[in-house]
C-alpha cells in the first residue's frame, strides 16, 4: 500500500449511545413525551480512524466492549449517535450467521435477493451466480431452502457472495465462525 492509496473508510468521533429504561412503562412514557427517565449507555465513544485500500483492520476486545456495534456502524446496519462515517465504494458484511437470508427461499433465490440488496443489477448477479455457487461448494443444495442448510453451508454461501462482488470494504464479525464452519 502506498500513502496515496485512497481511503475507503473515514471515521471521525464516532459514538453509539443506547437509552436504557428500567421498565417498559418508562419506555412508553418517553415515547409519549410524558417523562424520560432513560439512562445513557455509550457502547462506543469518540472512535476515529481511516482505512485505506489494501489495509486490514482487526477489532479485538472483551465481551461487551463494542466490537460488533462498531462493525454494524461501519456496515451501515446501525446508525451512530455521534460523529461522522464516510464509506467510499461498496461495503459488504457478514455480521450474523444467515442474516439477510430468508430461510424459506433457496440458496440461489437468496443470492439474487442479496445481490439486489447490495446494489447489483439482476444481470450482474446472474453473471456471478455460477462462480458464487461453485466457490461455496454447495452443489445441488443451492436449490434447496436455506432452512435445510447446516450453519457451515450458510456461512459458505454468505462468504462466497460477499467476496464475489469485490467490495472496497469487507466486514466480518466473529471470523472464527467462518473458519471453523468451513474447515
PLM feature spans:
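Pre-NBD coupling/linker segments of ABC/ABC-like ATPases
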Residues: 1-45
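Conserved ABC ATPase "signature" region
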Residues: 28-31, 92, 112, 124-141
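The feature captures the beta-strand-to-loop junction immediately N-terminal to the Walker
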Residues: 60-62
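Conserved Walker
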Residues: 68-69
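Helix-to-loop junction immediately C-terminal to a conserved catalytic motif
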Residues: 75
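Conserved coupling/switch loops of ABC nucleotide-binding domains, chiefly the family-specific signature
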Residues: 81-84
Amino acid at each position: 500500500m502506498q500513502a496515496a492509496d485512497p481511503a475507503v473508510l473515514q471515521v471521525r468521533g464516532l459514538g453509539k449511545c443506547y437509552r436504557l429504561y428500567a421498565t417498559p412503562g418508562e419506555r412508553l412514557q418517553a415515547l409519549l413525551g410524558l417523562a424520560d427517565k432513560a439512562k445513557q449507555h455509550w457502547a462506543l465513544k469518540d472512535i476515529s480512524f481511516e482505512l485505506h485500500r489494501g489495509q486490514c483492520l482487526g477489532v479485538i476486545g472483551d465481551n461487551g466492549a463494542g466490537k460488533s456495534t462498531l462493525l454494524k456502524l461501519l456496515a451501515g446496519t446501525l446508525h451512530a449517535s455521534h460523529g461522522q462515517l464516510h464509506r467510499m465504494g461498496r461495503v459488504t458484511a457478514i455480521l450474523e450467521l444467515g442474516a439477510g437470508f430468508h430461510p424459506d427461499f433457496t440458496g440461489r433465490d437468496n443470492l439474487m435477493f442479496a445481490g439486489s440488496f447490495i446494489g447489483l443489477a439482476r444481470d450482474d448477479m446472474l453473471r456471478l451466480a455460477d462462480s458464487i455457487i461453485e466457490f461455496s461448494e454447495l452443489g445441488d443444495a443451492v436449490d434447496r431452502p436455506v432452512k435445510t442448510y447446516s450453519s457451515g453451508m450458510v456461512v459458505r454461501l454468505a462468504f462466497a457472495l460477499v467476496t464475489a462482488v469485490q467490495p472496497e470494504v469487507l466486514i466480518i464479525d466473529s471470523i472464527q465462525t467462518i473458519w471453523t464452519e468451513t474447515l
